[in-house]
């Protein structure tokens, strides 16, 4: 089996990307009283979301974190869309949202999440900030802030904690 070379994110690299994200994101309008972090894909994004929510704290108050499960590439998104819709009350009590994801490969999860937030929850795009540590240059939805880009056609992104996952196609 031939695999693409890895774009491997070590624990040290993850920390570097988190710190870079803290630095590049304009957090001047983030206020814990009206802004929340949406932790997309908690199994991958818990670490970065937690660090950023605390880094963007004001007067000793960290941003709230709301976990949202997302699809793997081989899953239908409808279940996850319905599940996010069930979080309406938790999410809409905030005026601004920062969606945080460890890695954006295709952009499909950003796409349906933005659709739910804008069409169902009535958020304006200007009140939603998309942040990722790593993004494929060919993602169909582009994040507002990216700590590092890679090319998924040439490399396979992998984090140090990942093991075999039946949902990820090997190509």
Which residues does each PLM region occupy?
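Active-site-facing substrate-recognition patch
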Residues: 1-32
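Short glycine-rich phosphate-binding loop at a beta-alpha junction
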Residues: 31-44
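A short acidic (Asp/Glu
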Residues: 47-52, 109-112, 141
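Glycine-rich helix-loop-beta junction characteristic of Rossmann-like nucleotide cofactor-binding loops
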Residues: 25-32, 88-92, 121
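A general structural motif
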Residues: 32-35, 62, 92-96, 125-127
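Short, glycine/charge-rich flexible loops or terminal/linker lids adjacent to PRPP-binding catalytic cores
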Residues: 54-97, 105-115
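A structural signal for isolated positions on well-ordered beta-strands in alpha/beta enzyme cores
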Residues: 37, 66, 98, 129-132
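PRPP-dependent phosphoribosyltransferase catalytic core
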Residues: 3-8, 31, 115-171
């Amino acid at each position: 089996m031939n695999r693409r070379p890895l774009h491997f994110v070590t624990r040290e690299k993850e920390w570097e990307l988190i710190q870079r994200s803290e630095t590049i994101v304009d957090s001047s309008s983030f206020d814990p009283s009206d802004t929340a972090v949406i932790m997309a894909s908690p199994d991958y994004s818990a670490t970065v979301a937690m660090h950023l929510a605390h880094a963007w704290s004001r007067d000793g108050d960290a941003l709230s974190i709301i976990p949202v499960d997302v699809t793997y590439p081989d899953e239908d998104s409808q279940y996850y869309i319905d599940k996010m819709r069930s979080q309406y009350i938790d999410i809409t009590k905030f005026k601004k949202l920062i969606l945080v994801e460890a890695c954006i490969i295709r952009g499909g999860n950003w796409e349906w999440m933005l659709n739910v937030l804008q069409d169902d929850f009535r958020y304006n795009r200007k009140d939603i900030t998309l942040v990722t540590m790593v993004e494929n240059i060919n993602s169909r939805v582009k994040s507002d802030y990216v700590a590092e880009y890679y090319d998924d056609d040439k490399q396979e992104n992998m984090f140090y904690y990942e093991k075999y996952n039946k949902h990820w196609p090997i190509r």
